[in-house]
């Protein structure tokens, strides 16, 4: 059994002392873990995080002007999130769930989650440093998520949840300012994650171990920082995966800020494959 749920906390009315967004994210995840235990679905499979002004530095809308006056809001969020995982004895490093974190212009800290009775199998990308192993350059606490996760379903089916994926090699952003090349690199990373997921699936119990996935068959959400870049992104996807691929024809495109200010596009995806022989 799986549980789908939501948490929304307003920074205006639900502040956690003087800790700001860090305290709010800690509270949200602490409450989440308690709710999951009560529901009998303690294992997080996939999480979606939406933060107002994710690249900002304080309460001002002008993040650039505030640069250097404090910790970036995404890094504040990461601090509270990781501490909540640690306090609740949840896997904050190896075994962390698949997740994404996107920026919205205004609103509450919004978390959507999918949880189950059985822990998922985490999947990493060999082209990238695991997010939870990022160096301190990216903040005092690393992001808490795996690149993807495999979750067993009934009837031998297996679900693949791919975290938000972008133009990062190792731990560094590549192709800054070039949305076409960022899209190509993102697709290369998706291929690497799917290949790693197929290798990992072989370690599942039968009949789930026969499940296999294809990038072209993924259902995806494409987050774009600038709406004017949508056409260029779609052209690259059509060129690389084929304009008639399921990936291209069923993609959902949303405008959002990405967790790093130099990233222009991020793609998350999911799929279900049959493990039945």
Task: Describe each region flagged by the PLM.
Residues 1-51, 55-218, 224-277:
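N-terminal presequence-like segments and the immediate start of the first folded domain
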């Amino acid at each position: 059994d799986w549980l789908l749920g939501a948490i929304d906390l307003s920074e205006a009315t639900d502040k956690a002392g003087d800790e700001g967004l860090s305290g709010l994210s800690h509270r949200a995840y602490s409450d989440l873990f308690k709710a999951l235990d009560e529901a009998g679905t303690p294992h997080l499979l996939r999480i979606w995080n939406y933060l107002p002004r994710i690249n900002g530095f304080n309460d001002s809308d002008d993040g650039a002007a505030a640069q250097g006056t404090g910790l970036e809001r995404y890094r504040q969020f990461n601090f509270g999130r990781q501490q909540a995982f640690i306090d609740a004895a949840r896997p904050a490093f190896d075994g962390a769930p698949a997740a994404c974190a996107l920026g919205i212009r205004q609103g509450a800290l919004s978390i959507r989650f999918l949880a189950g009775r059985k822990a998922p199998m985490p999947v990493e990308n060999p082209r990238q440093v695991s997010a939870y192993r990022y160096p301190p350059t990216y903040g005092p606490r690393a992001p808490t998520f795996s690149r993807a996760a495999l979750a067993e379903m009934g009837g031998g089916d297996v679900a693949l949840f791919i975290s938000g994926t972008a133009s990062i090699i190792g731990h560094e952003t590549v192709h800054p300012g070039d949305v076409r090349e960022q899209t190509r690199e993102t697709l290369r990373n998706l291929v690497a994650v799917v290949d790693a997921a197929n290798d990992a699936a072989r370690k599942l119990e039968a009949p789930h171990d026969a499940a296999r996935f294809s990038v072209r068959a993924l259902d995806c959400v494409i987050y774009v920082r600038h709406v004017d870049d949508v056409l260029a992104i779609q052209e690259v996807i059509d060129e690389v995966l084929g304009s008639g691929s399921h990936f291209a024809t069923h993609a959902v495109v949303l405008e959002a800020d990405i967790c790093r200010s130099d990233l222009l596009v991020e793609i998350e995806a999911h799929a279900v494959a049959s493990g039945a022989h």
